[in-house]
């Protein structure tokens, strides 16, 4: 199990860094971290099939992941976007199948006015949960900022078509419809 100090080194980890860490664990003489090469191969295979995440390979539990998410959220709320960006990128790397990590990354990039990257991050979140209006709606905001009308309309239409009009979704659906109407008039 990775501890807090070990988690800090993962915040700026690249895929190559993660691979090196996995290799280091595989070659370790320490019985607590020794992992058979066969197990590594199985984990990597599961990773590419989407059956596990890097967090599983690193031994990061839900409490640690939630702690990292809270840290990223607090950085974001405090306007520390560079720190939030590092944290959300690490979270997306560690658990690529968790939509809220991609939403956090998208929101951070959007606040940094990196609209294309933000829209891409929102796109990952939308693919993972197409019934959540937030990723597509915020991607549309990014496309509007980029003056990409076609992609903005597509994102807004996905909000209207794919999202159930639940009390929490309705404000996004109503805003999407209103923006689409404004876009038709221009």
Label for each model-derived stretch:
Residues 144-167, 174, 178-181:
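TPR/TPR-like (Sel1-like) alpha-helical repeat modules
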Residues 66, 100, 133-134, 168, ...:
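Start-of-helix register in tetratricopeptide repeats
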């Amino acid at each position: 199990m990775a501890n807090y100090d070990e988690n800090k080194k993962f915040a700026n980890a690249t895929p190559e860094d993660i691979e090196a860490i996995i290799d280091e664990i595989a070659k370790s003489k320490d019985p607590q971290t020794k992992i058979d090469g066969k197990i590594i191969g199985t984990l990597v295979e599961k990773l590419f099939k989407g059956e596990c995440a890097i967090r599983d390979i690193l031994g990061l539990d839900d409490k640690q992941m939630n702690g990292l998410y809270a840290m990223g959220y607090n950085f974001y709320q405090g306007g520390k976007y560079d720190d939030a960006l590092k944290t959300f990128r690490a979270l997306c790397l560690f658990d690529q199948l968790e939509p809220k990590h991609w939403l956090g990354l998208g929101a951070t990039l959007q606040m940094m006015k990196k609209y294309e990257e933000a829209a891409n991050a929102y796109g990952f979140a939308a693919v993972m949960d197409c019934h959540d209006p937030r990723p597509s709606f915020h991607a549309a905001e990014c496309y509007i900022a980029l003056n990409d009308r076609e992609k903005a309309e597509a994102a807004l239409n996905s909000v209207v078509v794919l999202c159930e009009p639940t009390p929490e979704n309705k404000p996004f659906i109503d805003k999407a419809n209103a923006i689409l109407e404004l876009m038709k008039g221009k």
